[in-house]
Amino acid sequence: MKRTRKYQTALMAAVVSGLVFLPQAYAADTAYETDTVTVEAEGVDKYLVTTNTITAEEIAERGYRDLADILSQVPGLYMAPAAKDSKMVRVRGASSDQTKGYIDGIPAFPLTGIVSNAASDLSTIPADSIAKVEIIKGSGPVQYGTDYKGGVILVTTKDGEGTGKIRMSVAGGSNHTYDTKIGYSGSDKNVSYAVNLSKRYSAGYLENQMDKKIYFDGKIKFKTSSKSSLMLNGYYSDMEREVPQSVDPATGEYVLPSGPRWSVATGDGITPAQKKNNNATDWRFKGFKQSNIALQYESRPNDIWQYNVKYYHIIDENNLWVRNLLNTEGGSLPRFTHRAPQWYRSGWFSQGNGIEANASVAYDSKNVLSFGAKYIKLSWNTDENNSSYRRDGNDARRSFYVENAWSPDNRTRLTIGIRREDVTQDFRDNDAATQKTTSKSNAFDPVLNFTHDITKHDTIRLSAGRSHVFVGSKDAAGNIRSGYPVPKPERNSSYELGWKHKFGTKAEFDLTHFRTEVRDRITMVRFGGDCVLENVDKTHIRGLELSYRQTFSPKLSGFANYTWINAKDESTGMTTIASGLPTQMFNLGVTYREGKLRSTLLGRAMRARLDSNGEPTSAGYFAADLDLHYEPQTDLGLFLRVNNLFDTDYQYSWGSPADSTNFLLGVDMTF
């Protein structure tokens, strides 16, 4: 992990030389759209809150490889290093399990509603399958329910268009990495279709850091009439990933794990002392599978009224393996037994079905009324193999919403909506003979959004709304088992004030101030020997987002954004800093195009993350990536991605160092 000044100087000289000589490489001038995180006039902008849209063109130009990559440079979003080395997103300070994700309109990562863990690893979804990503922040649309505080992420996969074509990408690079993708798509008069398959592998830059992913998605859309369509779509992923030991940032040495010890049970020659002193290492996800299939019908009978109905089936499987240590390896176990196996597996599983119906009607020239309902039920179970301890249950949610959009004139837009959600959770321990315990909860939330065009270049927006976060059903089961009541839903009141200014057609500035007040915050507390969840805390979140983008010329464009967050927890009369969040983040990107060659430089800076006492848990840093793409002909492209260009030594979190300079070299082909 050592860095040398000589190496950095040589690398910088090579990069600068490449960028300097790019203008002389080719003489063709071509008009291009800007490659920045844009806020579009259509699409999610209709929600009248802060939104960001990243298109397929922008994804390709920046060399993003997966969804986590795409989201990493959106203002207000922090790619949080989560449990077991997974990548999850925190939106405006909200916990990673308080952001909803959808793929082609279907909920993704449903297990996060059961228990907050590493189930929602955003790096699972490859960027090559994505047509666009839309991020909704603030008091979002009521149609997505009430149980999100952070925001909503909408992923749309690519449609087929025109004559059937095969797309293929093959790449390899540092750490024995390979990344292969193949897709087929097309359309005729009444049918469009698209399928994508990808496989990625990396040995990792640390010991025990192998990462292997397989992903498939597909959709077929039938035009049933000139005003209606039927779509069958779905996705499947299978991941195997090793989780390395922590690395001390001061010494660069591996740190022996301090736990957990749940993979060891006393008895059969295993003493309480051996259980207490035993550590575990070589964590691994294996058999981490997710799949979703959906049938969606939409129709617009006339210019006044439209509706859609969707049904989906979800399966989620999450197997976590851990290897116990022997004495000779630093642990305390004298031998492996059935109470202390060499490899121990703990699994989380869920499957369920959902149905939704949404409609809107323009009942006069200034008003549109939208309404809908949803029902989703997930059945889940866990298996703790070593102790033969099993839990299972169900999580059922019913919701409806009504929203009216009013435009008194062509400069002002106002939406008022309400949503209701009812949650029923049941739980059973150990065996089928045990009677299930049931808990119920509900929430009723209003949302107000307003925008006004002050001038043709300036727009202000204001939003206020309330949301609720329900306790996960597996966590609720833990409270019931220990004899404690299930916590009430967490109440969140969100407000934002924003201003957008357009400098003609080539530049845009956006400023947003946001605030979230959390009541009845759900947190873990200890009563004697029991660790249970309870409503004891409050959280106050304040923040500021600034973003700017500009097309300087047909060849040169760029963007920059800045986020400031101040989050504080309040408990038993004491106020502390909310830990684990960086207070400031800055992103920038510059793209230069010359004929058939394109170069993009992306940078990110982050201030140190702090603990509850205000002490840094990791150092701040600045890092940059370079993406080069050469297209000798329309159906062939060569690319080089250099990550951590300046070999910055930094950590995602304490014990999780970032890779040094690494690369990926590949070719894209279309047949």
State what each model feature region is.
Residues 1-74, 221-226, 293, 300, ...:
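N-terminal Sec signal peptide and the immediately downstream disordered periplasmic leader
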Residues 27, 223-224, 404, 462, ...:
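Conserved C-terminal beta-signal and adjacent last beta-strands/turns
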Residues 32-163, 497:
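Acidic, small-polar-rich N-terminal luminal/periplasmic segments of exported/outer-membrane proteins
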Residues 172-201, 206-247, 254, 283-306, ...:
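Transmembrane beta-barrel wall of Gram-negative outer-membrane proteins
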Residues 191, 304-324, 377, 451-453, ...:
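Membrane-embedded beta-barrel scaffold of Gram-negative outer-membrane proteins
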Residues 202, 229-295, 300, 315-349, ...:
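Flexible loop and strand-edge segments within Gram-negative outer membrane beta-barrel domains
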Residues 362-370, 374, 391-517, 551-554, ...:
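Structural signature of Gram-negative outer-membrane beta-barrels, strongest in the C-terminal barrel
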Residues 409-414, 514-517, 535-613, 629-638, ...:
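Gram-negative outer-membrane beta-barrel transporters
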